Regions:
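Catalytic pocket-lining loop regions of alpha/beta-barrel enzymes
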Residues: 1-72, 80, 97-108, 146-164
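Active-site microenvironment of metallo-dependent hydrolases
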Residues: 120-165
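His/Asp/Glu-enriched, well-ordered alpha-helical/loop segment
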Residues: 66-134
Length: 165
């Protein structure tokens, strides 16, 4: 994504996003079904700084391949805890003016479930129901229960580079 100043979207009247719009159009035109698109740092950055761009990106990606072919990624190795991105995705909705003008569909609860994990589970042939039943007492579940008992206060800490002085 090009560096955009506040108040700029980099999107023309037709909704064109350089590279993304053309790529999505090619996918739709060819009917290719073996492509999965990943939401990573571009979602995190755009949802915070350029919500209109984020709305167009999600609208175009989901329109091109369907919510069943979009997977969640966070680039957390570079940015620390992904919780802030997950919370943003759970709350974000494509703005209604974009839905009306460009025909983007609202992001449904089912879309979010697919994107946040069910699509990846399907790709890796993981039976989600069986996996939930198989690990009720594992260390991760015990940490989750302790976290819930402590009041479920998520960390929104971001990590990054620090300039040497």
């Amino acid at each position: 994504m090009t560096m955009l100043l506040p108040g700029q979207s980099g999107i023309d009247e037709s909704g064109n996003i350089p590279w993304t719009t053309e790529f999505c159009a090619q996918i739709k035109a060819t009917g290719v079904k073996n492509i999965y698109l990943e939401l990573g740092a571009v979602f995190g950055h755009s949802v915070v700084t350029h919500a209109e761009v984020c709305g167009h990106l999600l609208g175009q990606l989901i329109d091109a391949v369907g919510s069943d072919h979009v997977i969640w990624g966070t680039d957390s190795i570079w940015w620390g805890s992904p919780q802030w991105q997950i919370e943003a995705f759970r709350r974000f909705q494509i703005p209604e003016p974009l839905q009306e003008k460009f025909g983007y569909k609202p992001i449904s609860t089912r879309d979010r479930e697919l994107i946040l994990g069910l699509n990846s589970a399907r790709l890796f042939d993981i039976d989600v129901q069986a996996a939930h039943k198989a690990i009720p007492g594992d260390a991760m579940n015990q940490m989750k229960m302790a976290y819930q008992a402590a009041g479920e206060e998520p960390s929104m800490t971001q990590y990054g580079w620090i300039a040497a002085v």
